Amino acid sequence: MDLRKFIRDIPDFPFEGIIFRDVTPLLKNPQAFQAAIDKMAETVSDIDFDLIVAPEARGFIFGSALAYKLHKGFIPVRKPGKLPYETTSIEYDLEYGTAKLQIHSDAIDKGEKILLVDDVLATGGTANAIAQLVKKLGGEVAGTCFLVELTYLNPRERLRDYLIRTVISY
């Protein structure tokens, strides 16, 4: 199945000159969504890991579905004020400012191997910040997995220390 047919291009969103790769048509189609999760699972089949960590919002969708398929635990990474227990935070730079992410401080045990999952790998900023959170808690980033990679933004440069697996590249 050609999953690209289920990814809609939205020009000038969220800013002029940006082409947003919208995965919601893929999520709407049960066969495409299942194929996407199956392909993501195939791409990480050789990676030894204990848990999947993924950011809100679309990362939750792909990360939790992949965790279910692979019989792994799932750890959410959220924006500040969304997690009910003690958290560990990281602030990181965006093209247009800064952002902050949080994870429960007890979410990862020392030495646990983590697979970081998200829908789109754009600049690599969010993924790099999450990797830093994982390390802060004593975890090891075993690899990363994304449905879509925007190669023209050179995200691998920022994530050069990590194994990167993607299903679709633009």
UniProtKB/Swiss-Prot annotation:
Keyword Cytoplasm tagged: yes
UniProt KW keywords: Cytoplasm, Glycosyltransferase, Purine salvage, Transferase
Cellular compartment(s): Cytoplasm
Pathway connected to this protein: Purine metabolism; AMP biosynthesis via salvage pathway; AMP from adenine: step 1/1
Entry EC no(s): 2.4.2.7
Catalytic class of the enzyme: transferase
Residues annotated as signal peptide: none
GO molecular function, one term: adenine phosphoribosyltransferase activity
Family: Belongs to the purine/pyrimidine phosphoribosyltransferase family.
Function of the molecule: Catalyzes a salvage reaction resulting in the formation of AMP, that is energically less costly than de novo synthesis.
GO cellular component, one term: cytoplasm
Subunit structure comment from the entry: Homodimer.
Record flagged with keyword Ribosomal protein: no
Name of protein: Adenine phosphoribosyltransferase
Chief place of localization: cytoplasm
Gene name as annotated: apt
Catalytic activity entry: AMP + diphosphate = 5-phospho-alpha-D-ribose 1-diphosphate + adenine
Alphabetical GO biological process terms: adenine salvage; AMP salvage; purine ribonucleoside salvage
Pfam families: Pribosyltran
